[in-house]
Amino acid sequence: MSAEKGELDLNGAKQNTGMWLVKLPKYLAQQWAKATGRGEVGKLRIVKNQGKTEVSFTLNEELASIQDIGGKPASSLVSTPREHPFLLQSVGGQTLTVLTESLSGQSEDKSENRVIDKLALEGIVVHRAECRPAASDNYMQMKRKQIEESSKPKRQSQQLEKAVTSNYKPVSNHQYNIEYEKKKKDDGKRARVDKHQVLDMLFSAFEKHQYYNIKDLVDITKQPVTYLKEILRDIGIYNMKGTHKNTWELKPEYRHYQGEDKSD
């Protein structure tokens, strides 16, 4: 993420606005996102019980119905628990703040090319809490459905009564497999011959051309690649860079080119 600095609005700090930092269950946040109209999602209740503060949240009834679980449509009607008591926690000596930002020049990918016009400090966290579902039949049913959906295989096999020919026609074997099997069969036919015979074939080839790649030498000698490389290491040099990169040539002591004969 690339972000450019903008103005910092500290009105929230000046007003000493207290904020609550509350951890929500994932399903509850998803239900909140479905709120329409004024965006009212429920009611927050704060009471004093024997000098102790008790906080609970009640979800609106119209948001309690779950249409999908884990990104998949729910197979049956499932309702979330509506009652959620808060577990209050201390801030623990930390100074936590809530910031908001307004962006411009933002691309479709929100993680890139972010330009922050304005950064505002809305307030300071004075309470931390965890919003937990109350134990109920709805909650147990929802968790049971989540477990059932997560245990279903992502892909299922299905037996077709007739062949699908709209896109691909069935074949006994694919061309790639045919070529691979042919190559494998040809390689198996390459039986090792005497080393001196291979050397004769190699010297004869290098009299015609100075450089060869390994594929051409395999075609010429009809020898397995590993066996051929063992022999080439004795008489040849493998070029790893330059104009003739990835090719073999004879070592100087084995060369008998016409140009060298004239220079001698």
Swiss-Prot record:
* SUPFAM superfamilies, sorted: Rap30/74 interaction domains, Winged helix' DNA-binding domain
Q: Which GO terms describe its cellular component?
A: transcription factor TFIIF complex
Q: Give the subcellular location.
A: Nucleus
Q: Which InterPro entries match?
A: TFIIF_beta, TFIIF_beta_HTH, TFIIF_beta_N, TFIIF_interaction, WH-like_DNA-bd_sf, WH_DNA-bd_sf
Keyword set for this entry?
DNA-binding, Nucleus, Transcription, Transcription regulation
**Subunit structure of this chain's protein:** Heterodimer of an alpha and a beta subunit.
Protein name in the entry: General transcription factor IIF subunit 2
